[in-house]
């Protein structure tokens, strides 16, 4: 038997989402429940994929099945497509398995032509309705199927209204509608040099398949991790009309409030209108509860159906309906999109109502949604009035409003005067850390979602919009330009880190409101998950923040970030330009108390929870100045000649610093650095243990960039010699642990050997991804877009762990490590530690913990619980 590509609504059910798409599956489900659903059929997602395999054509076999089901639809409805006596009109709508509202295309009133319009006018005794439906169809078909500009059709409508001296579409009469039909057809003919077609169904179905790959659908898929291989289904359904007269209408409603979660029907409707009128906002709709005055019978039926649907689907529903001559028809139901606050309230309320279990509640909330709860938000009313000047990548969520500055120094200076600033840069570097920290938000011209700016901003919970190519930078002259408009230093701008929108004025922000539902919901997540969640934190402030968000320790303290602050950088630079180990030790002695104080602060903030401290990782040249003024100043401070300093800087230059003199290689060349860091770690832990004996802190020392067990053995000896001596002298009983990062593929391949020396592994997936792919994270943004456009990659491997390649190394290292040290502790501390899909992978391969930015801790806690629910059955 030939493969089945088409299903009548009553042949399927809601479990068939993968094949019928969300809309088709739910239409089938509603039909099975005996609800008033207009007759129709669904063309499957497999037909969409076949369409692309057949070079964007619908093959004869699929066409034959479509015509067979059209014949069935005509028999059931008693109407025929294109028939003069009793014409059938249909809608052709998309329906992917994941909800993608507004991303793909819809065509209504298909089957309309001049003769059909005349018949409909006679049958309904409503000429205006017939020609209104006809002109809408020409407009939609021309736009969706033939690619003509929507805007020109709107202009033609405005011209006709102006001629008549009217402003409202409702005041257009039957003659006006006839005139619009002729004007629309003339525009169509003029643009496409052909008459408006009589055969329309296959063209419309092809257009919906094509819309799966329109730019906005591709962008939405990328944003929501929806694979392009899923395809969209197409639903062909008999039209019911909300625009036939005053006893007709159309509306959209939610079973609960999608903004607040309140258990009250929420929605809008319009009488004498078609579906898109409600969404388009041309006319102001009425609130749903007013429907009981206008159409009481339809309202009562609708309320009963909403209750039945929510109980059946065990989730808040978003529904579309039409009333034709007083009779209610259901056109769609789906799980409704909702704010994070609403999601938590609905989940908790439904558990209290006995409708769902706590496991179902946990699966109901999208982990990434929790992000928006933790950052300041724009005032919703103010945001509605604002118009974006540009849009770029939403790299770190939140709402930021401040005055433009162009350098980290300016940011620090202005912030010290209590001025709110937005740091605008071509790109950021580690030296900008302090300026970034004091800024309300960060806007970069270059860089992607995992650029330096994005990673650091997320870690700090600072709003960041990156990669805005529309900006022409003239920072030397104190301004940047977008679309010919100049924005000067000191001007107010606002950034929306959730959408990537940039606004040219100040928009009021309000603090994020975390409700009691949040704590209750997260407790359910913590009870369910087996994977521990730690944080990446470099300061006591970050550590405290993460602890409040529920972190169970720190998986990564990047000690180099501490070196960039204030006076410390001078001592670090002094150490770098020293010629002998003795000179280096003098400089390191200055850094020691600062590092020790930082570590004490972090231990205090974490109150006895485990803390993993990574030793110095970046190449030394990153700590040296790059502009001539700073170089001259450093030479003076160091009492050395300018040429001599330039020679040192030049000698540290590397062609490929990512794979150069960094990580454990620095500790091997300069063991005194590891000695100083060990002294700081152990002394800090001993001091805090003395103050809080019940905390029993056991420092975890992590050696970065190990590729061979001999490297680890050498550095470990340096660490243990210092640590053992200090502990012995203190006369306190304190354990410590030495482990390594697995971030070089060779280390993953030799993990069994390395585990003999390492008490724990932490997978540094940022570098492991770079080294496995051979991509530089800082440069990949320049060509990865081509990979996405050409469907070579669907996802950014720096944002979502590459499970097939990098993941295979992680799995291998996990198994090899445990083969020689069964109790080895395993975690992940790259950016992937906060990505739900990557967390699911970590759960599956049996890691002990994930570590992520403080503001991603709640996301990771929920994602870990969802992984346990999915895979521990």
Regions found by a protein language model. Name each.
Residues 212, 374-406, 520-526, 530-537, ...:
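Flexible inter-domain linker/hinge segments
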Residues 235, 405, 422-424, 443, ...:
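Structural motif
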Residues 392-431, 482-520:
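Extended, non-globular alpha-helical segments
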């Amino acid at each position: 038997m030939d493969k089945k590509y088409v299903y009548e609504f009553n042949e399927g059910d809601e479990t068939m989402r993968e094949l019928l798409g969300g809309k088709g599956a739910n239409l089938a489900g509603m039909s099975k429940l005996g609800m008033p659903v207009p007759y129709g059929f669904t063309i499957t997602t497999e037909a969409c994929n076949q369409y692309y395999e057949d070079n964007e054509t619908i093959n004869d076999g699929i066409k034959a099945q479509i015509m067979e089901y059209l014949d069935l639809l005509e028999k059931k409805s008693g109407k025929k497509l294109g028939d003069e006596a009793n014409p059938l009109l249909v809608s052709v709508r998309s329906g992917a398995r994941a909800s993608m509202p507004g991303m793909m295309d819809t065509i209504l009133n298909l089957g309309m032509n001049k003769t059909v319009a005349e018949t409909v006018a006679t049958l309904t005794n409503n000429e205006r309705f017939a020609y209104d439906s006809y002109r809408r169809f020409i407009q939609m078909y021309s736009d969706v199927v033939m690619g003509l500009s929507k805007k020109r059709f709107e202009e033609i409508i405005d011209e006709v209204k102006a001629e008549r001296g009217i402003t409202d579409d409702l005041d257009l009469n039957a003659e006006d509608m006839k005139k619009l039909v002729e004007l629309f057809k003339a525009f169509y003919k003029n643009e496409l040099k052909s008459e408006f077609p009589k055969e329309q169904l296959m063209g419309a179905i092809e257009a919906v398949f094509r819309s799966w790959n329109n730019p906005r659908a591709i962008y939405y898929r990328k944003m929501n991790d929806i694979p392009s291989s899923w395809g969209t289904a197409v639903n062909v359904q008999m039209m019911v009309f909300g625009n036939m007269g005053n006893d007709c209408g159309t509306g959209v409603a939610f079973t609960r409030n999608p903004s607040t979660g309140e258990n009250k029907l929420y929605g809008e409707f319009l009488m004498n209108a078609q579906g898109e009128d409600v969404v388009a906002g041309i006319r102001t709709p009425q609130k749903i509860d007013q429907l009981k005055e206008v159409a009481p019978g339809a309202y009562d039926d609708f309320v009963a159906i909403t209750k039945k649907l929510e109980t059946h689907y065990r989730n808040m529903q978003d529904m579309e309906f039409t009333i034709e001559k007083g009779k209610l028809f259901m056109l769609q139901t789906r799980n409704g999109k909702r704010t994070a606050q609403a999601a938590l309230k609905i989940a908790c309320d439904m558990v209290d109502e006995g409708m769902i279990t706590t496991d179902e509640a946990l699966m109901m909330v999208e982990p990434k949604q929790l992000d928006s709860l933790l950052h300041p938000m724009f005032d919703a009313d103010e945001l509605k009035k604002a118009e974006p000047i540009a849009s770029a990548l939403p790299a770190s969520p939140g709402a930021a409003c401040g005055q433009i500055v162009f350098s980290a120094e300016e940011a620090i200076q202005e912030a010290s005067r209590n001025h709110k600033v937005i740091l605008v840069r071509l790109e950021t570097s580690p030296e900008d850390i302090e300026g970034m920290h004091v800024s309300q938000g960060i806007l970069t011209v270059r860089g992607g979602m995992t650029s330096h700016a994005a990673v650091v901003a997320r870690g700090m919970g600072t709003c960041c919009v990156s990669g805005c190519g529309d900006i022409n930078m003239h920072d030397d002259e104190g301004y940047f330009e977008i679309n010919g408009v100049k924005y000067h230093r000191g001007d107010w701008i606002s950034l929306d880190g959730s959408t990537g929108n940039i606004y040219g004025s100040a928009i009021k922000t309000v603090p994020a409101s975390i409700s009691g539902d949040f704590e209750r919901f997260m407790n359910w997540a913590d009870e369910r998950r087996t994977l521990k969640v730690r944080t990446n934190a470099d300061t006591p402030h970050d550590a405290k923040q993460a602890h409040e968000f529920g972190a169970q320790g720190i998986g990564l303290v990047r000690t180099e970030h501490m070196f960039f602050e204030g006076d410390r950088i001078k001592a670090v630079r002094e150490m770098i330009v020293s010629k002998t180990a003795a000179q280096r030790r003098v400089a390191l002695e200055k850094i020691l108390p600062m590092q020790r104080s930082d570590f004490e602060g972090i231990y205090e903030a974490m109150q006895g929870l485990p803390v993993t401290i990574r030793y110095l990782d970046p190449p030394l040249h990153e700590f040296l100045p790059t502009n001539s003024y700073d170089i001259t100043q450093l030479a003076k401070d160091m009492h050395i000649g300018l040429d001599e300093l330039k020679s040192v800087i030049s000698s540290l230059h590397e062609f490929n610093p990512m794979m150069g003199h960094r990580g454990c290689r620095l500790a091997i060349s300069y063991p005194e650095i590891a000695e100083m860091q060990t002294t700081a770690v152990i002394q800090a832990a001993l001091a805090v243990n003395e103050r809080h004996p019940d905390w029993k802190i056991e420092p975890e020392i992590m050696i970065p960039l190990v590729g061979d067990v001999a490297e680890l053995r050498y550095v470990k000896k340096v660490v243990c010699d210092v640590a053992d001596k200090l502990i012995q002298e203190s006369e306190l009983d304190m354990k410590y642990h030495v482990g390594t990062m697995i971030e070089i593929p060779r280390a993953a391949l030799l993990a069994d050997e390395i585990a003999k020396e390492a008490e724990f592994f932490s997978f540094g997936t940022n570098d492991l991804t770079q080294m496995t792919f051979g991509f530089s994270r800082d440069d990949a943004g320049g060509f990865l877009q081509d990979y996405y456009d050409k469907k070579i990659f669907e996802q950014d491997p720096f944002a979502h762990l590459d499970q097939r390649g990098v993941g295979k190394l992680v799995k291998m290292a996990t198994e090899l490590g445990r083969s020689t040290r069964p109790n080895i502790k395993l975690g992940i501390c790259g950016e992937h530690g906060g990505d739900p899909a990557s967390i699911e992978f970590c759960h599956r391969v049996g890691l002990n913990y994930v570590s992520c930015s403080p503001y991603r801790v709640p996301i990771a806690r929920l994602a870990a619980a969802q992984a346990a629910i999915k895979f521990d059955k």
